[in-house]
């Protein structure tokens, strides 16, 4: 299959956000959701937070090999069994790739191929509390170490490298509106899948019944008119 055909069947969704905002969890939740909604697509999650380079963190973009990450995005899913062939509606299914992590919106090349870019927004106090819970802090010494790391490294990293990527988002989901934000996000991905299937199959699916969790059109959500949609 040529590169153009592969690109036509690839949907990239990028989800960024600050430390301990649940970016990885929402990506896995979306993966499970779309596995239940569609059996004709391959779904992959690329979690940048699990791909930090080296043993010593720099607390900046140099912690990530974006060339390698981009190659993983471009990598075509291989159908490995006859069961896979039977399972899919057609032999070469759509690839849905969810790129997530603090730096998911940092690389320009990944942003350019992403059909939807999302930023999970949360205030500093809530991020710190979530981080303490995530690290399962059990002693005053551990708490002191974590707060030192937060003040000396994580907070400056958020301010200098992660927070600025918020401007690249098409959709901003605040922590106070997660359920509504998730509904909008799911329906946006559904629309991207149906549009892609329509292009592949060469027919109009506008009248086709699809899962309706949130209607972009009915709510006058025009991403071409407005650079991003902020739910706060």
UniProtKB/Swiss-Prot annotation:
Q: Name one Pfam family in it.
A: PRK
Provide the family line: Belongs to the uridine kinase family.
Gene Ontology biological process terms, A to Z? CTP salvage; UMP salvage
The cysteines covalently paired via disulfide bonds are none
> Under which name does UniProt file this protein?
Putative uridine kinase DAS2
Q: InterPro entries attached here? A: P-loop_NTPase, PRK/URK
Please list the GO terms describing molecular function: ATP binding; cytidine kinase activity; uridine kinase activity
Q: What is its EC number?
A: 2.7.1.48
The alphabetized UniProt keywords are: ATP-binding, Cytoplasm, Kinase, Nucleotide-binding, Nucleus, Transferase
Q: Where does ATP bind?
A: 17-24
Additional info? Present with 4280 molecules/cell in log phase SD medium.
Subcellular location(s) of the protein: Cytoplasm; Nucleus
**Source organism:** Saccharomyces cerevisiae (strain ATCC 204508 / S288c) (Baker's yeast)
Q: What is its main location?
A: cytoplasm
Q: In which pathway does it act?
A: Pyrimidine metabolism; CTP biosynthesis via salvage pathway; CTP from cytidine: step 1/3; Pyrimidine metabolism; UMP biosynthesis via salvage pathway; UMP from uridine: step 1/1
């Amino acid at each position: 299959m040529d590169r153009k055909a592969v690109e036509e069947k690839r949907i990239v969704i990028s989800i960024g956000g600050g430390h301990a905002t649940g970016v990885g969890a929402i990506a896995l939740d979306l993966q499970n959701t779309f596995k239940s909604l569609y059996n004709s697509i391959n779904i992959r999650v690329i979690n940048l937070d699990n791909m930090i380079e080296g043993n010593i963190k720099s607390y900046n973009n140099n912690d990530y090999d974006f060339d390698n990450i981009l190659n993983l995005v471009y990598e075509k899913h291989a159908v490995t069994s006859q069961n896979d062939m039977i399972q899919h509606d057609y032999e070469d299914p759509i690839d849905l790739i969810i790129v997530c992590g603090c730096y998911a919106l940092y690389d320009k090349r990944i942003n350019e191929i992403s059909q939807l870019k999302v930023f999970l927004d949360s205030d500093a106090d809530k991020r710190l509390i979530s981080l303490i819970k995530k690290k399962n802090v059990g002693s005053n010494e551990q708490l002191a170490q974590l707060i030192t790391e937060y003040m000396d490294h994580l907070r400056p990293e958020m301010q200098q490298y992660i927070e600025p990527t918020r401007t690249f988002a098409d959709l901003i989901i605040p922590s106070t509106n997660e359920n509504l934000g998730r509904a909008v996000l799911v329906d946006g991905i559904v629309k991207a899948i149906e549009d892609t299937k329509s292009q592949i199959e060469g027919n109009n699916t506008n009248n086709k019944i699809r899962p309706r969790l949130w209607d972009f059109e009915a709510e006058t959500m025009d991403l071409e008119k407005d650079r991003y949609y902020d739910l706060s």
